[in-house]
Curated annotation (Swiss-Prot):
This is Elongation factor Ts. The keyword Protein biosynthesis applies. It is found in: Cytoplasm. Keywords: Cytoplasm, Elongation factor, Protein biosynthesis. The lineage of its organism: Bacteria, Bacillati, Actinomycetota, Actinomycetes, Micrococcales. Transmembrane segments: none annotated. CDD domains: UBA_EF-Ts (cd14275). Belongs to the EF-Ts family. Residues 80-83 are annotated as: Involved in Mg(2+) ion dislocation from EF-Tu. InterPro entries: EF-Ts_dimer_sf (IPR036402), Transl_elong_EFTs/EF1B (IPR001816), Transl_elong_EFTs/EF1B_dimer (IPR014039), Transl_elong_Ts_CS (IPR018101), UBA-like_sf (IPR009060). Associates with the EF-Tu.GDP complex and induces the exchange of GDP to GTP. It remains bound to the aminoacyl-tRNA.EF-Tu.GTP complex up to the GTP hydrolysis stage on the ribosome. One of its GO terms (cellular component) is cytoplasm.
Amino acid sequence: MANYTAADIKALRERTGAGMLDVKKALDEADGDAQKAQEIIRVKGLKGVTKREGRSTAEGIVLARTENNVGYMVEVNSETDFVAKSAPFVEFGNKVLDAAVAADAADLDALLAAEVDGKPISELVTETGALLGEKVVVRRVARVAGDHVAVYLHKTSKDLPAQVGVLLAVSGADAETAAHDVAVHIAAMSPAFLSEEDVPAETVENEKRVAEETARNEGKPEKIIPNIVQGRLKGYYKDVVLVDQDFAKDSKKSVGQVLSEAGATATAFARFRVGA
């Protein structure tokens, strides 16, 4: 019988993210040699790649950082939260983020073609999935540039790394504090657009049409319907447009007002939430 302890099993599980039964089988096959067992898990994982292709990857983490006034953010996914919080998966996520920064990647195709340690990210994805015994994916990347870029990462569970991330670019010499506060606001309130001008015209027209039809169905006088439509459109903007939203820390002010008082202007943002 192979000579290994419960501590050996725990350590190998933490290194590989593999299940307990798979770890014990690998240690048995390797006569208790942890390095050999890790290689056995990796090889068996590679053989199972095709079987994992159709599996759902609803768990994961978000990682972000800035470099020379440019913010980069990536979302990487796994099948289970056990793997998502494992050291190998977090290391994988950091390598993906490093590649995004090095390649100045602004879209997923550019990121997947980027290299880490002499190999493309797409190959690293396959190897990591083999090691962990789960399907892993690089879901998306964001690049935001500006005079100042704030980064905010939020943990939705104390047991997991960050699963919500925000990049916010602002202009203005003394905008750091306001930028951080607004980044936290974005994480909580999930705006869809930076300004009213960013809302697609067809979306605006649809909101107007719905508001008009609703007003008529409610029997409102025809002469006041245009005012009702404008009022409801304003309410829609307040829900989805960042600068129009009530500021989370002080609902008496809009986000736009908070930025203006700090001498700042928001120029771009990105928000990721795992699975959303």
